[in-house]
């Protein structure tokens, strides 16, 4: 039943919080005068539906103190989040939308927010403060400046060059991590743990390896060795579908609960976090709220990245070209649904190490069921974002592994890459242009347009593709054929043709 609307809804903040307790659950733990044990870089929707929720549960159900979160916006684009966090005292509404039921509550585990472009030094000092035990990250795959093809730091990126030469005003997470750890080092303090919460294979190992490479470029070998020896960075597997917030969600929260919230979060009910127990300066007891804290995350991580994220990307590019708006519509397309199931069964699952207690085909089916949730309204366009960071981590590794096998199978994987390449032209199948949101968009689009049905222009981008894939004549021939079919007949026809061959 509608209780309010946007004109009569009450703005959410610390002063009004109590007025909502008869409508939905609110934080009952103290939020003032508590220490922030975690500094989180990159406060987007996913962080607020995942790590912040686990911390909220610990504070709400187990009365944990001094582990609240100080959020940090690194980019100029984070100004909108800064304004919302400031106006709302870092409170926000979380709406969990299932296929049948909806659950909502107010989250208060973020108790401070800093906007780095305004005062980078203040952020560095906050990270260096001994009360900070963990610096966590959700900066997207592109924020790591890691080339999957060369397994190295992108040292020619302008932002990395800036951070090497202008430590007083960093652009990347490495500039901030380096300067903050340097202060801890000079002050004789234990280093904080760097905890990546991004969807990447070996996310913890990757961020630490890239940070050490960055430190070595700064020509302080002793400090670089200290980072390598003392700083911990656990691997993790994170999972929760969390679409971008739009005015539609803001209106829904206002109409349903009478809350005027500038930054609500809508997510699926499912939530999972598998975390390596590797911390240098303590950690909260996450096991109490359902986090799987384990010795080795690798098998869980590969399963999720290859099956869920890889499947997501395949559905995204092919579904976009097929004219779909929402992911649940793509899942309900019988041809694409069958394609994802066969792709996983034939070309991805055989490459995966076993995960205790998990049947991979059942996992794939559960993923498709989650994606079919129409209440989430997850857009295909969102899934297509930042492909240069996603495809080399979610899809291309399976191709590399198949190419190394004498009887390697990759026809279905090639269709996914063909869909991505056709998408990168920035023009849909009806000739309508659209914007490609990707840090490499100008380079990718120029190569896609120039190459057309010939994939070589894109394959020659060395930061994305290694010679192993670029010089494999059989794979390139298969990719070329799939790309031609997508261009000439459309994505559904290309999928059907390949399904008939496997």
From Swiss-Prot:
This is Mannitol dehydrogenase DSF1. It comes from Saccharomyces cerevisiae (strain ATCC 204508 / S288c) (Baker's yeast). It catalyses: D-mannitol + NAD(+) = D-fructose + NADH + H(+). Pfam families: Mannitol_dh, Mannitol_dh_C. GO terms for biological process: mannitol metabolic process. Its EC number is 1.1.1.67. Catalyzes the NAD(H)-dependent interconversion of D-fructose and D-mannitol in the mannitol metabolic pathway. There are two genes for this mannitol dehydrogenase in yeast, DSF1 and YNR073C. Present with 125 molecules/cell in log phase SD medium. It is an enzyme of class 1 (oxidoreductase). Disruption phenotype: Rescues temperature-sensitivity of MPT5 deletion. Belongs to the mannitol dehydrogenase family. Keywords: NAD, Oxidoreductase. GO terms for molecular function: mannitol 2-dehydrogenase activity; mannitol dehydrogenase activity.
